Design a protein with these regions (language model features):
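Short loop/turn motifs at secondary-structure junctions and domain boundaries
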Residues: 43-48, 182-185
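Conserved hydrophobic beta-strand signature of PAS-family and PAS-like sensory domains
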Residues: 200-201
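N-terminal capping loop/helix in small sensory signaling domains highlighted by a polar->aromatic N-x2-3-F motif
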Residues: 19, 204-211
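Conserved GNAT-fold acetyl-CoA-binding loop/helix
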Residues: 21-42
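Sensory modules in modular signal-transduction proteins
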Residues: 174-196
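Acyl-donor (CoA/ACP) binding surface of acyl/acetyltransferases
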Residues: 1-23, 51, 55-178
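PAS-family sensory/regulatory domains
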Residues: 27, 216-218
Length: 218
């Protein structure tokens, strides 16, 4: 469940905001003092117009947050993005709730909103080069490499890996295999991706083991 942050979320937010490793993965200063945590929470709640809490449906407890913001200037200046409309996502999930599909579910919901209802051309998402779980999640969702940036953090300069996901309704088909693969790979049934000549170009892992045997791409 995604919703705006509420004052009642502060204790749950404070519980995961003090995680130093999470702060390092996000490139922010460590939050130890309650005043610093409060300042950070109030900013997200009151000043970020598109910051949403990621909430467990069963108990309505906050387990993370997701931001939708304008594209960073260095990425907005890239030639391949000129004339295109996009937004940047950032997210975090408390350690106890990671690897349970919550982040993927939240990101997919936001992507659907940005693509289907707001008609953006792309969604951009990145992570620091040492944040392997985030990188793998983005790639699993169909994001493709866009650029590397070197940015300052409280712990020193770090390199980021920036990814992009194109809107399938506004993008040439040649760019979309990664997107569609990410969608059908979530299905436990046999699903195939074909071109207009009905030639199989991709089968999800649940379909067959030997793609080439059935005329598909390896």
């Amino acid at each position: 469940l995604l919703r705006r942050l509420e004052e009642a979320d502060f204790p749950a937010y404070a519980a995961y905001a003090v995680d130093d490793e999470m702060s390092r993965m996000m490139g922010r200063a460590f939050l130890h003092a309650e005043t610093d945590i409060r300042q950070n929470f109030d900013w997200l709640k009151d000043k970020e117009p598109r910051c949403y809490g990621i909430v467990e449906k069963a108990n309505e407890q906050l387990i993370g947050n997701l931001n939708i913001v304008a594209l960073p200037a260095p990425l907005a200046a890239l030639p391949q993005l000129q004339g295109k409309r996009g937004q940047t996502l950032s997210f975090c999930i408390r350690r106890e709730s990671q690897r349970k599909g919550y982040a993927a579910e939240a990101i997919r919901a936001v992507i659907a909103e940005l693509f289907d209802d707001e008609h953006f051309d792309f969604v951009q998402c990145g992570c620091y080069s040492f944040n392997t779980p985030s990188r793998m999640l983005q790639e699993r969702l169909g994001f493709q490499f866009l650029a590397n940036l070197c940015v300052p953090t409280p712990q020193g300069e770090a390199q980021t890996i920036e990814h992009i996901l194109w809107n399938p309704r506004r993008t040439p088909m040649s760019d979309l295999n990664a997107y569609f693969k990410s969608v059908i790979d979530q299905d436990t049934a046999s699903v195939v991706l074909c071109d207009l000549n009905h030639t199989i170009v991709y089968m999800n892992p649940a379909a067959v083991v030997d793609y080439k045997k059935y005329g598909g791409a390896s």
